[in-house]
Regions:
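Walker A/P-loop NTP-binding motif of AAA+ ATPase domains
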Residues: 218, 222-354
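AAA+ P-loop ATPase mechanoenzymes
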Residues: 2-240, 253
Length: 354
């Protein structure tokens, strides 16, 4: 590397420019050719960048209010999002989950430096019920038992419509109780949601839309008595035996396929079984299945809210299946799940096919 404008003089022959300031340029050889860098401009740009950086992190209005409430200088943060209607249901369960030991002492929404009321929405639940949830806003929670146990919960919606919950607890403060572990709070919330939340025992589809059980569906079916008795025994009666089978370490899962031409009432029979089931029922239409991962997710969800009747409509057309393709990977995934090769404790898959 050589400074531009410097002559090739001998060391004992001083240059006329010897007393001038050194050139601020230096050149760099690259495969694309030579280019020059003005070190003065580079230094000025670097200084300007440093000048723009804050010398210290300043607390905004929210931080100041939060730290004052928590009586802490630092917080431990946990955050998670859930897609679409699942996120709204998770927020609905949050109130139920916290109610035994915590109460809201203040809630607000800050927009452009101004405190405003939180934004709420009302969502449908099973049984034509509805529940109000906080969509956007912040809540300050305080223990009903130990008042110094406090935390902040922020409810928000991401740009793509996913619902998010963010938790702040005082760093280094042990607030764990027999019910709540604040170092693992959101995982515990999810676990309780699937165990005792609004999906448990409900009838819904893969997009978490609730389906009402029709009490008059018996009047809409013309039954073959033997088919009715077999289905009642293999599905409805079996449901009641599932807890005991699990207790004894025996298989409490089985699969059923309803086959017949279109219009013979297969879907109606599946809904009849759901109407008479006391367990969670999930209805999955063929267009909701596009790949093996979708199948796995269906069974993962069914296991989480088990015992579950998992109804899969038109299994032969799911994921653009050809019913003649016996070695199709999607069909193989279904069959493995149904015959117990993949453990699905507490899940009864019921598939319909043409």
């Amino acid at each position: 590397m050589k400074e531009k404008g410097t002559p090739n003089n001998q060391e004992n022959e001083p240059s006329p420019e010897a007393n001038e300031a050194p050139s601020p340029f230096f050149s760099v050889q690259t495969p694309m050719g030579e280019f020059s860098v003005d070190m003065k401009e580079f230094a000025d740009a670097k200084a300007a960048a440093y000048a723009m950086m804050p010398k210290q992190k300043r607390s905004n209005l929210f931080d100041s209010k939060m730290f004052t409430f928590l009586e802490a200088a630092k917080t431990q943060r946990d955050s998670r999002y859930w897609r679409g209607h699942l996120g709204a249901l998770m927020k609905a369960h949050l109130d139920v989950y916290l109610e035994p030991e915590f109460e809201v002492v203040e809630e607000f929404l800050i927009e452009e430096g101004v405190f405003r009321p939180c934004l709420y929405d009302t969502i449908p639940l099973q049984g034509n019920k509805r529940q109000r949830i906080m969509v956007l806003g912040t809540r300050f929670y305080q223990s009903k038992i130990t008042p110094e146990h406090r935390f902040t919960l922020i409810s928000s919606v991401d740009g793509d419509g996913d619902h998010r919950v963010t938790l702040h607890v005082p760093a280094g403060r042990n607030m764990n109780t027999e019910r709540y572990d604040f170092s693992n709070f959101i995982n515990q919330l999810e676990e309780d949601f699937y165990k005792a939340g609004p999906l448990n025992g409900a009838f819904f589809d893969l997009k978490y839309n609730f389906i009402e059980r029709d009490p008059n569906i018996d009047n809409l079916l013309a039954w073959d008595s033997k088919v009715k008795e077999t289905l009642w025994s293999d599905i409805i009666t079996f449901q009641k035996a599932m807890p005991k089978l699990k207790e004894l370490g025996l298989s409490n899962s089985r699969g059923v396929i309803l086959a017949g031409p279109p219009g013979t009432g297969k879907t109606m029979i599946a809904k009849w079984l759901a109407a008479h089931s006391d367990i969670t029922c999930i209805l999955i239409s063929a267009e909701m299945i596009t790949g093996r991962q979708d199948i796995k997710k269906c069974y993962e969800l069914a296991r989480k809210v088990s015992p579950t009747l998992l109804i899969i409509e038109d299994i032969d057309t799911a994921g653009a299946l050809d019913r003649r393709a016996a070695d199709h990977p999607l069909l193989g995934e279904f069959l493995q799940s149904m015959d117990g090769i993949v453990p699905n404790h507490g899940v009864i898959p019921l598939a319909t096919t043409n």
